[in-house]
Amino acid sequence: GFVLSYPPSTPWERVRDATLELLSPTRCVACECPGSLVCDACAARIVTIDPVFACLRCGAPFGSLLCTECQSESSQDDQVANNCLAACVFEGVPARIVRAYKDGGERRLAAWIAHALFDAVHRAQKAVPKRMDAFALDADAVVFVPATPAAYRRRGFDHMEAVAREFSNLMGIPVLDALAKWDACDQRKLGRGGRLANAADAYDVVEPVAGMRLLLIDDVITTGATMAAAS
């Protein structure tokens, strides 16, 4: 599930974290209850996606075939994400977690998000093993959707690189910094057409990955434009 804790790995980290905890106690990023980054009550409210009843292309929780959005784009395969797996619905608690991590400076959530992704893979391996055989079980490496240079400067770190490194440790496969992303406008306020146009040709492959089976991860999938362009 999503109730997780991550003890520091070195004596220095334990001293540092204990001092920080005294000065500024950890609070739940969703409800501000003291004690943990995500409290048990908020974790219990997270709506996970059952892969058995998810769109085969984008992973949305709208049935076991193609959702209506993917059906409408079925003739434009180059612009649509394919064979995606989503951990949970991006609303309520998960939305607060991602915002606290990306824009609120709570970098400790990288491990939490990585565990959520790993939990989704584990559930899918049990529920839809044939589908998972297609990419997860034999993956050679993890690749992450990189931040734009502007987003990196604003946040001071690449949020998905940190998640990818945690996730790759859980999966037992290496992480590759294989993609470079050029500056583009923020997609959060764009519609479907705008997202597709914005994402097109936004990425370059900067590592030799030909012939490899890769797990591409990102924090949020809306229209699938980013995942399609990056893949």
Residue ranges and their predicted role:
Residues G1-S231:
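Glycine-rich phosphate/pyrophosphate-handling loop used in enzymes and phosphotransfer proteins
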